[in-house]
Amino acid sequence: MIWHVQNENFILDSTRIFMKAFHLLLFQGSFIFPECILIFGLILLLMIDLTSDQKDRPWFYFISSTSLVISITALLFRWREEPIISFSGNFQTNNFNEIFQFLILLCSTLCIPLSVEYIECTEMAITEFLLFVLTATLGGMFLCGANDLITIFVAPECFSLCSYLLSGYTKRDLRSNEATMKYLLMGGASSSILVHGFSWLYGSSGGEIELQEIVNGLINTQMYNSPGISIALISITVGLGFKLSPAPFHQWTPDVYEGSPTPVVAFLSVTSKVAASASATRILDIPFYFSSNEWHLLLEILAILSMILGNLLAITQTSMKRMLAYSSIGQIGYVIIGIIVGDSNDGYASMITYMLFYISMNLGTFACIVLFGLRTGTDNIRDYAGLYTKDPFLALSLALCLLSLGGLPPLAGFFGKLYLFWCGWQAGLYFLVSIGLLTSVLSIYYYLKIVKLLMTGRNQEITPYVRNYRRSPLRSNNSIELSMTVCVIASTIPGISMNPILAIAQDTLF
């Protein structure tokens, strides 16, 4: 009898919860419409996979790409609408969040055609790969719009779990397995530290979980300058540091870059940084408003360490992917300058502008690496020697993307860094900007070293990989070359689009 009553109560409670969730989705689902499009695409992928054979493989790519493009379109139509808080405070919709969601969707849209040929050559499972990419994209989008501590914790875990699975997708590769294990262990440790910081923030604010309500709670409890807030700040900075991978939280980055499939590295190298930057900006700027001096100091230390260590260690690398791993550590140091400057002096606008250029530069470089790797099977920097003699288009594309990453004028990377450093200088961050300028010059050295190898025509320096290099038919690689061409153009011709990009970025206020 008791069991029967408890069972009825459980059914009633479950029904109420389901009806409440259905009510929220029905009346507030429009606020997360771009995310709903991706969810629909995921369901459609699963249904087609269950009911079709291998001949329908092109449909998988088409559905994934189409859902991403439609989601981008939905975001653009919603641009400049009034900020809205929905789902009982779980999500916030505003220009700042939406532009980061747009960047994540853009990354995923460019990464899918970049992966097609690689998946077919390595005989990887297509459906699962695309499901993981779309789910990670969905997690990143939810993270950008998250407005409470629970969602901010759950959304990156959704992204991270898919990232772990993607990095270990080539199960027979020992390096991939090792990289995945390191990634998983360090990711789990960082998540526990992050949630520990959230618990201190929750307790100090009197039990509040929404970001703005936490500020009000700290004022009411007079705990905004307490030791508990300092513990929360340090713990959350460490937890977010793993996602952003600045020094000294970069230990996982080189191994994961080297061991993971190259299209996966391309995807993770940009989406993780975009999502984590959006989350870090909002968490530090809103709940830790009264501790701005403290978190500015912490981020300045991370930025200096990242710019110096990342660029110095990149010089010594022999693997192209490991070199880009250390380069990305240096690049996140530049992005942190924009976070420190904040909304004053266009800090966020400069950060967003540089991230947009970084996406094109980085994905363009990885597209070239994927193409070269498929045709030669090597990742060693020395094996790129003389590539210009065999494939001028690929060599020039790689050279332009690398030089743009280094910030050589008149490429996009130069304008992005110029705007970022100028905003930092205007905000009084003279030492930080000076370090950024010096390390940028240092990065040009190792990028130019690779460009010199690409353009060499001496037979004694050309390796057997390039001597036996054979270009594949254009039809078989057109998807990779399409992504590569788009990224190269975006990395080299910023002048036409610079002013509109800056104007849009300057509108991204909270």
UniProtKB/Swiss-Prot annotation:
TM regions (residue ranges): 31-51, 59-79, 99-119, 124-144, 149-169, 183-203, 229-249, 295-315, 323-343, 354-374, 395-415, 418-438
GO molecular function: NADH dehydrogenase (ubiquinone) activity; quinone binding
Domain of life: Eukaryota
Reactions catalysed: a plastoquinone + NADH + (n+1) H(+)(in) = a plastoquinol + NAD(+) + n H(+)(out); a plastoquinone + NADPH + (n+1) H(+)(in) = a plastoquinol + NADP(+) + n H(+)(out)
Membrane topology label: Multi-pass membrane protein
EC number: 7.1.1.-
One BP term from GO: photosynthesis, light reaction
GO cellular component: chloroplast thylakoid membrane
Keywords: Chloroplast, Membrane, NAD, NADP, Plastid, Plastoquinone, Quinone, Thylakoid, Translocase, Transmembrane, Transmembrane helix, Transport
Alphabetical list of PANTHER family matching this protein: NADH DEHYDROGENASE (PTHR22773)
Quaternary data: NDH is composed of at least 16 different subunits, 5 of which are encoded in the nucleus.
Function description: NDH shuttles electrons from NAD(P)H:plastoquinone, via FMN and iron-sulfur (Fe-S) centers, to quinones in the photosynthetic chain and possibly in a chloroplast respiratory chain. The immediate electron acceptor for the enzyme in this species is believed to be plastoquinone. Couples the redox reaction to proton translocation, and thus conserves the redox energy in a proton gradient.
UniProt name for this protein: NAD(P)H-quinone oxidoreductase subunit 2 A, chloroplastic
Organism: Oryza nivara (Indian wild rice)
